[in-house]
C-alpha cells in the first residue's frame, strides 16, 4: 500500500479500518484532484475551468436507502418513525464487505471539519473512491490549515464507494444502494450511488444527532448578518427562496444551508455551498453564476456542449443540477462562519393555496408550531390536467436529516427565541390573488420590501391585525407596499372561495400536527390555526 500527501503520521488509512493494494491520496489540493479526476475519466473541465461530473442513475439523495444502526445507545434517542433501523450485525457485515471492496481501489482522503465553532466542531475524515468526490467534500466542509493536518484526529469517518453494491439479504437493506450510519462509532458507509450530496448530508445528520445534547440547536437554514451585527436566520424548504433571499449584497452571508445556534451565537456547519443551477442566470443570481466559471467549482449533472459551455436551462439529465464551491467564492461571505445571537428568524413558505399573508409575526409558541409543521406547497408539474397544489409538511424544515424527535429541536428553538428575545416572522413567497392556476406568484419586490422592514426593525412598530385563520399578527400597512396584498382574502375576487380554501389548508395543518400533540406543551397546541370566518 502506497500513501501520499499530507497527514497525521499516526493516523493513516488503517485507523479507518481500511487497507488497499492501491494508492491512498491524503488531502490533495484542487489542481491535484483535477489531474486525478481527468486522468481517471471521472470528469471533464468546462470552458470556464469548473470540473464537470455526472452521477449516473442517482441524481439526488436516496432517503429510502438511508439507515441508522439501532443499538442500546440509539434505541431511545432516535425518532424511529422517521429513520430506518439497521441491526449492528448487518452493519458489521456491511463494514467488512466495504473493507474487502476497498482492498483493490485507489482511495482519496480529506481531513475536514464540520462546524465553524471550535467548541462544537466535528473533525471528519472522508474517504472516497472518486477524486471528484474528494474535491466536492473539500469544497463543502471546513478545511483545517495545512499545518493542522499533521495533528488531525478524526472523530467521524465517512467512506463513500459508489462501485460497491449492497446485498439486501446480507446487509439488511432495501436495494444495492445504501447509506448506513453507526452513530455510536461515528462511521458512515455510502455505496451504490455517485450522488455527492449524500456525504454532505451524512455529516449534517451526525451533527443534528450530537449537538442538541450540548444545548446547541442544529438548523437546516441559511443565515446572514447586517452591518449593525443584526443576524437573521432563514428556514425554508426547497423552492421557497431561502438561498435567493439570504444572498443580499448589503448583508454578510454566513452560510446557505446548515447552521448551529448555541450560547455564543450561530455558526456555519460548512465551508461551502451546494447551489441548484437549473435555470441559473447571470442576471438573476450573478454571484452564484460567477462561481460556475471558476477553477475549483464542481458542476454536478450540468449539461455542457461540445465546447464545454454549460447549459443551465437543460434539465434533461435531472432538474437537480448543482454546483459546489467554497464559501470564499462569494464576495460578501463571512470569513469566520460565525456570528452573534440572531435578532430575527424568518420561516419561508411558498403557499400555493393563496391563503397565507406575505408576512406575519409569530409568538415563540407559534414559531415552534410552524417550525414543527415545516409547511410549503408543491405546484403541478408537467402532467396533463394536474392543476391542484400539494401541501408538503417537512418537520423542522428538514425532516430527512433530523435523527432525533422533532420536539427536541422545537423545544430548543422556542427556548432560544425566548431567551434572546428574537423576532420571528413567517414569510409567504407563494401565491396571492388566488391559488396556483388562478392567482400569481408573490412579487419578489414585495417580499424583499417586507423582509427589509422586518430586518431593519421598522416593522416592529407597525399596526397589526390578527389573522382569522392562523391567529398570527399581520401588519396592516408597510411603507412602499400596497396594503391590499397584506390581506390575502382581499386579493381574491371570490371571497367565499378564499374562505373554503383557508378552511381546507387549516384542516391540513391540524391533521398533520396530530402526531406532535403528546410531545408539545399547551401553549404550542393553542398556537394551532382555527377557522374563524372573516367578515366581508
UniProtKB/Swiss-Prot annotation:
GO BP annotation list: gluconeogenesis
Protein name: Phosphoenolpyruvate carboxykinase (ATP)
Gene: pckA
EC number: 4.1.1.49
HAMAP family assigned: PEPCK_ATP (MF_00453)
PANTHER family: PHOSPHOENOLPYRUVATE CARBOXYKINASE (ATP) (PTHR30031:SF0), PHOSPHOENOLPYRUVATE CARBOXYKINASE ATP (PTHR30031)
Key words, A-Z: ATP-binding, Cytoplasm, Decarboxylase, Gluconeogenesis, Lyase, Manganese, Metal-binding, Nucleotide-binding
Residues reported in the UniProt entry to bind Mn(2+): 201, 220, 257
UniProt keyword Lyase present: yes
A Pfam family reported for this protein in Swiss-Prot or TrEMBL: PEPCK_ATP
Taxon lineage: Bacteria, Pseudomonadati, Pseudomonadota, Alphaproteobacteria, Hyphomicrobiales
Reactions listed under catalytic activity: oxaloacetate + ATP = phosphoenolpyruvate + ADP + CO2
Keyword field contains Repressor: no
Originating organism: Chelativorans sp. (strain BNC1)
Amino acid at each position: 500500500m502506497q500513501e501520499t500527501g499530507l497527514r497525521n503520521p499516526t493516523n493513516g488509512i488503517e485507523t479507518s479500518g481500511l487497507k488497499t493494494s492501491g494508492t491512498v491520496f491524503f488531502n490533495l489540493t484542487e489542481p491535484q484532484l483535477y489531474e486525478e479526476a481527468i486522468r481517471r475519466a471521472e470528469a471533464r473541465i468546462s470552458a470556464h475551468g469548473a470540473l464537470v461530473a455526472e452521477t449516473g442513475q442517482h441524481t439526488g439523495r436516496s432517503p429510502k436507502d438511508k439507515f441508522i444502526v439501532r443499538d442500546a445507545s440509539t434505541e431511545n434517542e432516535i425518532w424511529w418513525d422517521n429513520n430506518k433501523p439497521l441491526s449492528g450485525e448487518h452493519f458489521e457485515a456491511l463494514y467488512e464487505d466495504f473493507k474487502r471492496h476497498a482492498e483493490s481501489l485507489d482511495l482519496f482522503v480529506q481531513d475536514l471539519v464540520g462546524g465553524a465553532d471550535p467548541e462544537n466542531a466535528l473533525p471528519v475524515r472522508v474517504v472516497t473512491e472518486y477524486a471528484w468526490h474528494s474535491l466536492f467534500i473539500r469544497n463543502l466542509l471546513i478545511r483545517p490549515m495545512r499545518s493542522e493536518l499533521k495533528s488531525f484526529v478524526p472523530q467521524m469517518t465517512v467512506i463513500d464507494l459508489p462501485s460497491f453494491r449492497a446485498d439486501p439479504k446480507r446487509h439488511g437493506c432495501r436495494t444495492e444502494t445504501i447509506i448506513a450510519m453507526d452513530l455510536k462509532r461515528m462511521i458512515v458507509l455510502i455505496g451504490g450511488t455517485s450522488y455527492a450530496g449524500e456525504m454532505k448530508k451524512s455529516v449534517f445528520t451526525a451533527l443534528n444527532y450530537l449537538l442538541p445534547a450540548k444545548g446547541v440547536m442544529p438548523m437546516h437554514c441559511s443565515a446572514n448578518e447586517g452591518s449593525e451585527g443584526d443576524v437573521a436566520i432563514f428556514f425554508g424548504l426547497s423552492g421557497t427562496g431561502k438561498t435567493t433571499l439570504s444572498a443580499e449584497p448589503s448583508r454578510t452571508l454566513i452560510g446557505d444551508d446548515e447552521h448551529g445556534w448555541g450560547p455564543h451565537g450561530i455558526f456555519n456547519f460548512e465551508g461551502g455551498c451546494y447551489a441548484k443551477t437549473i435555470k441559473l442566470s447571470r442576471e438573476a443570481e450573478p454571484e452564484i453564476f460567477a462561481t460556475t466559471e471558476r477553477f475549483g467549482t464542481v458542476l454536478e449533472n450540468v449539461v455542457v456542449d461540445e465546447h464545454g459551455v454549460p447549459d443551465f436551462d437543460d434539465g434533461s439529465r435531472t432538474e437537480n443540477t448543482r454546483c459546489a464551491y467554497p464559501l470564499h467564492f462569494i464576495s460578501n461571505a463571512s470569513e469566520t462562519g460565525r456570528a452573534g445571537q440572531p435578532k430575527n428568524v424568518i420561516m419561508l413558505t411558498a403557499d400555493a393555496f393563496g391563503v397565507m399573508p406575505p408576512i406575519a409575526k409569530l409568538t415563540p409558541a407559534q414559531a415552534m408550531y410552524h417550525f414543527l409543521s415545516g409547511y410549503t406547497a408543491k405546484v403541478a408539474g408537467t402532467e396533463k390536467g394536474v392543476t391542484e397544489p400539494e401541501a408538503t409538511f417537512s418537520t423542522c424544515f428538514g425532516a430527512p436529516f433530523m435523527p432525533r424527535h422533532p420536539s427536541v429541536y422545537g423545544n430548543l428553538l422556542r427556548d432560544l427565541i425566548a431567551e434572546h428575545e428574537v423576532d420571528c416572522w413567517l414569510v409567504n413567497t407563494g401565491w396571492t390573488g388566488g391559488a396556483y392556476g388562478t392567482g400569481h406568484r408573490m412579487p419578489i419586490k414585495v417580499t424583499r420590501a417586507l423582509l427589509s422592514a422586518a430586518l431593519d426593525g421598522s416593522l416592529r412598530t407597525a399596526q397589526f391585525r390578527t389573522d382569522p385563520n392562523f391567529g398570527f399578527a399581520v401588519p396592516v400597512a408597510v411603507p412602499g407596499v400596497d396594503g391590499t396584498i397584506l390581506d390575502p382574502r382581499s386579493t381574491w375576487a371570490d371571497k367565499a372561495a378564499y374562505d373554503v380554501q383557508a378552511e381546507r389548508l387549516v384542516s391540513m395543518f391540524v391533521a398533520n400536527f396530530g402526531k406532535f400533540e403528546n410531545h408539545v406543551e399547551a401553549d404550542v397546541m393553542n398556537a394551532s390555526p382555527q377557522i374563524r370566518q372573516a367578515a366581508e
